[in-house]
């Protein structure tokens, strides 16, 4: 990347010293940012308890911990969204406090949130410079200058987007890149990235890592929150671990391995992340022949046995999710045959799929799974409510007993069934949604990105459940973008590329190299 990764921004306003503007580095301090004895509580919850953290200039600090460990709360304090109850923040060696996110931005701290915060009906340029618009001599917004600055910024970040394109027309991955460009545009010394690769492709991940490397070479400090351990060992200089609102420790990334990192995160050793299972010996339950959906995927064929876990791998846009949605009747196929339990079936809608014995856990639990304003019980009972209703009455007692039983079996951690599901951790939300579908007694369970956005401890729980269900004879289709997960859990792996089925690998022959080769569109000979 040539030159600096920042464009010449529209002029910044003068900053009040009380918000930390104009801080000069302390020559005696080796740290860019220091967090000392920070505590933060909410009604009935201690989110952070006497935590500490330090960030060196020109380094990447990975922040790891299970959901609910306090990572996001601490980042929101650093970014000025929350104020701590006790403790001190030092920036460039000087004590500082932020009363608003704007004051943190003006002091040189920018945060890229996991939940994107762009305005869909505004252009890329307008989103990047909102609140900092360049004015012309008539004190009107100078759109030409904003376009120039944006084009320069995007070019230096090698982001190939039109500054005038509406953000609403962009893919999730492209919006993520705009968020990154916006944060870089502030020329901040500290950048906080919260799960920045959760919705982007492998190619875009590499692009992001090259941007991070460039920013690091300029002396920027980057705090990188992720659940993906391979990313930690690829780009992080140091790793800080949080657990249950407390600071566990900080180590050089090069001195750690996956096992030691997991042990620090969960407080116990996960000796076997992927449970050992016997090879399934059940009969063929589902047979798919030449299944096609015009313009999306074509001639997909596979058999699925009772008790088998079939993994589906492929890059974003390969058609994996579309195949799952077709099997569940969301988008019925144009051609091909589906045989279920020896009989040819036509699945025209999800209701038919559920009646046959199919269940689908969708890839985006927030968008297509959860009813965030409803309780845990209301979310869990959604798929079976009709079975417990009649003559104007709902069998609440029987439903409650069923939900309580599923919570115990799946180890869903919630204060009560009446708790708003939006307050649970990602892992517990996912287990509650899995419980919803298990209550329908499915014979084929389709899981689309079952562990996306959940911590390693919750992942181990999901893997245990999948293994248990398969051992009881349930047929499982698991779609995942995480290759170790696909290889560790699947009896066979089907690989797709741009709507085409490239091949099916047996567990004994499946490797990351072979899967990626197929996923990139190359046949394995």
UniProtKB/Swiss-Prot annotation:
Residues 1-20 are annotated as: Disordered. The keyword DNA damage does not apply. GO terms for cellular component: plasma membrane. SUPFAM superfamilies: P-loop containing nucleoside triphosphate hydrolases. PROSITE patterns: ABC_TRANSPORTER_1, ABC_TRANSPORTER_2, MGLA, RBSA. Pfam families: ABC_tran. Keywords: ATP-binding, Cell inner membrane, Cell membrane, Membrane, Nucleotide-binding, Repeat, Sugar transport, Translocase, Transport. It catalyses: D-ribose(out) + ATP + H2O = D-ribose(in) + ADP + phosphate + H(+); D-galactose(out) + ATP + H2O = D-galactose(in) + ADP + phosphate + H(+). Residues 33-269, 279-523 form the ABC transporter domain. It is a peripheral membrane protein. GO terms for molecular function: ABC-type D-ribose transporter activity; ATP binding; ATP hydrolysis activity. ATP binds at residues 65-72. Its main location: membrane. Its EC number is 7.5.2.11, 7.5.2.7. It comes from the Bacteria. It is found in: Cell inner membrane. Disulfide bonds: none annotated. Belongs to the ABC transporter superfamily. Carbohydrate importer 2 (CUT2) (TC 3.A.1.2) family. Part of an ABC transporter complex involved in carbohydrate import. Could be involved in ribose, galactose and/or methyl galactoside import. Responsible for energy coupling to the transport system. This is Putative ribose/galactose/methyl galactoside import ATP-binding protein. It comes from Pseudomonas syringae pv. tomato (strain ATCC BAA-871 / DC3000).
